[in-house]
Amino acid sequence: MAFEKEPHCSFCGKRRSEVDQLVEGCEGYICNDCIEESYVLLNGAEEPLIDDSQNDEKFFENVPTPHQIHAHLDDYVIGQEHAKKVLSVAVYNHYKRLRNALSHHQETNGVELGKSNILLIGPTGSGKTLLAETLARRLNVPFAVADATTLTQAGYVGEDVENVIQKLLMKCNFDAELAERGIIFIDEIDKITRKSESPSITRDVSGEGVQQALLKLIEGTVANINPQGSRKHPKGETIAVDTSKILFICGGAFAGLDKVVEARTHTQSGIGFAAELKKDKDREDLTSLFKQIEPEDLVKFGLIPELIGRLPVITPLQELDEAALIAILTKPKNAIITQYQALFKMEGVELKFTKDALTAIAQKSIVRKTGARGLRSIVENLLLDTMYDLPTLKNSQGITKITVGKGCVQNGDKPKMA
């Protein structure tokens, strides 16, 4: 299997192509995400990682409108216009709901507003995590990411589901009120589906058990969290967090869901087994199919109905094509190419990529099926030798300009130096 050949993080299991950096040790690897989490844990989040100066009233006054949220997403995320619009509205309404609860429902004449958690469906590298992270950054709220495949139900070996809340608390110096404004992104939610849509003895008990445990958090409960590493709570007393106030965004690739949707939408009524799917030539593309997703499709895929009911906002993300990947390399704020150009500029050297080189990078990512997530790894490997030699070469040869061409990507040619 490719997974066995490709180095992966010994802690979270993510492959090298799925992370920005993978550091090798004597007997394993650790990715940049796990390094960051470890740093926060070891340092006890001494300083709040977000601005905690706003009280509730001031915070809710400053919640951006859907148009403002969408505009901010445009700065960092290429494409996915429908998903951006859906997220902008859902997030805006979520914080209106919290504001209404704070006023004891006076703004709605006693009407309680339900919470609309979100399910993002899209292939690896389509921007699910980036969208959620960018939302949290714009709103200035705590943000935590959890991998559903590492979570276990009570009584099993692994990471307890409530550890997700602990991660969120770490991001705001264990301030429960700040955490309750936060956003939690649960990735790989599709990997904990049960094996059959019909409850039976053959189902994936552990997978469904994790779904049940997540359901409790997502629908709302008071979680009592042990604040490990907190200097605010040195005696180890638990912190109560009301999860009904936290916005949960779940994401997954849901490989094979298109076949479930297609079977429902294309099946023609007939006698006995006469119903059949349309031929491949009439098959709709993946994006079109995912726009037709219904809760019943997710049940057939293996999510429990109760969990689907707590994720009412379902939005598909498009698979990124060549043009979108090229745009991701160059256009957003903090674009990958811009970051490397800044690194080279610190050495007094101009870094350029030809159009053909950018196209080749995008094509390589498509072949690897890593989407936008794999772009940084490709560029990093492409420039590794150059960055290694650069400090020496610029002094000995007076290098001021480096150009990366198509051959560098496809054939391993060295960049041109001048």
Curated annotation (Swiss-Prot):
Protein name in UniProt: ATP-dependent Clp protease ATP-binding subunit ClpX
Q: Which residues bind ATP?
A: P123, T124, G125, S126, G127, K128, T129, L130
Any idea which UniProt keywords this protein has? ATP-binding, Chaperone, Metal-binding, Nucleotide-binding, Zinc
How the protein assembles, per its UniProt entry?
A: Component of the ClpX-ClpP complex. Forms a hexameric ring that, in the presence of ATP, binds to fourteen ClpP subunits assembled into a disk-like structure with a central cavity, resembling the structure of eukaryotic proteasomes.
Residue ranges of domain ClpX-type ZB in the record: 1-50
Select a single GO molecular function from the record's annotations and give it: ATP binding
What PANTHER family does the database record attribute to this sequence? ATP-DEPENDENT CLP PROTEASE ATP-BINDING SUBUNIT CLPX-LIKE, MITOCHONDRIAL (PTHR48102:SF7), ATP-DEPENDENT CLP PROTEASE ATP-BINDING SUBUNIT CLPX-LIKE, MITOCHONDRIAL-RELATED (PTHR48102)
Task: Point out the gene that encodes the protein.
Answer: clpX
Q: Which residues bind Zn(2+)?
A: C9, C12, C31, C34
Organism expressing this protein natively: Haemophilus ducreyi (strain 35000HP / ATCC 700724)
Instruction: State the family it belongs to.
Output: Belongs to the ClpX chaperone family.
Q: What cystine linkages occur within this chain?
A: none
Pfam families recorded for this chain?
A: AAA_2, ClpB_D2-small, zf-C4_ClpX
GO biological process assignments: cell division; proteolysis involved in protein catabolic process
Functionally, this protein is described as follows:
ATP-dependent specificity component of the Clp protease. It directs the protease to specific substrates. Can perform chaperone functions in the absence of ClpP.
Q: Which GO terms describe its cellular component?
A: HslUV protease complex
